[in-house]
Amino acid sequence: DFLFVGPSAAQVLANMRVAAATLHEFGLVNNLAKLEGPAQSLEFLGIRIDSTLRTLSVPDRKLEAIVPKLEDLLSRRFVSVKKLRSVLGHLSHLSMVLPAARPFLRGLIDAVHYRQQESRRHRRLSGALREDLAFWLHHVRGWNGSQSWRAESDPVVLASDASTTGFGWVLEKAPKFTCDRLPSFMQPGHAVAGYWGEDLREMQSLSNNIGWGELFAPVAAARRMGPALRDSHVVFVVDNAGDVEVINRRRTTCPRMRTLLRDLCKLSLRYNFAFTAIHRPGARNILPDVLSRPSIHQHDLRVPSVCDKVTKEVIKDSIPKTSAPEPKPFAFGSFFLLDPMSKSAASIPLMFPLG
């Protein structure tokens, strides 16, 4: 199948004629019965594309078909591999419109391809798989099947970092419609710093757990901004290449990180924002790095003090001036205050106000 996109119906029609002639020259048959368009709304590979409403949508018949299949699976203890594959195919198709829902397919994929049971025709539904299926059932029931295109040309940019003792992030950039939704103390240029709670401190002190901390920071930032991210495109800037891959592929084999990734995806589905991650070398990610290290900022988070510490880190690392960040990273204002979290909630990383 071929999809032609152009600025006008005449241009698209001309492109279609050229393609038809080319296919004919190679002896290929054009199936005119499947021809559709030119139009501003058409169905391609089972997905309806509407350039006027700027939406991608799944036809109602596909949504209606998956609901009874999910209900049937959830009513059983053992399910045939054939039924699991059928549901997996339907949900994989839906995830083309909802890429943030892909992490909730992992359990179903594992159940279908579990090697130790390949010879068995039925699978037992685990508690985790049931939770995934229930998530899909709940979401499909309340979803109209469409997803709006996001404003990707002017993204929200969040830079973050984490260490074995803490984490931090700064809102570097945001489009006007996002800024209008944010209070004055959360505008671009404002930042957050935090440290790990008591029951996380020992675990996060191990360097092999740094990936979880690096992922926690952007997830916490997205949760904090919440509704302000609606219909936007969020770019997470991190200095951990592994986390960049996890965020962009919506996939991880680490159970702890999978929980965070699912939280991020749920936020994306709730507020309809797209998200991607890019890698910034640690030598250039100085401000988030300072915020993530209590040993450096020593809880003195006044703007002049943090600016001084950032400058010292730049000098210490001997970064060429052409690639060094500006010495005054808070040109848009001071830090914003973050409500302190109760120390009794030891399972939650602790955050403190920034002065």
Give the location of each predicted region.
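Mobile genetic element proteins and their domesticated derivatives, centered on retroelements
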Residues: 23, 46, 66, 70, ...
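A short, polar/acidic, helix/strand-boundary loop motif
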Residues: 175-216, 242-255
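Two-metal-ion RNase H-like nuclease active-site motif
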Residues: 153-165
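Catalytic palm subdomain of template-directed nucleic-acid polymerases
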Residues: 1-26, 47-58, 94, 242-257
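Flexible, low-complexity interdomain linkers flanking nucleic-acid-processing modules
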Residues: 49-87, 290-355
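RNase H catalytic domain
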Residues: 1-4, 10, 223-287
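C-terminal reverse transcriptase regions that engage the nucleic-acid substrate
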Residues: 38-149
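Acidic carboxylate-rich catalytic motifs and surrounding loops in phosphoryl-/glycosyl-chemistry enzymes
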Residues: 28-43, 47, 273-286, 290, ...
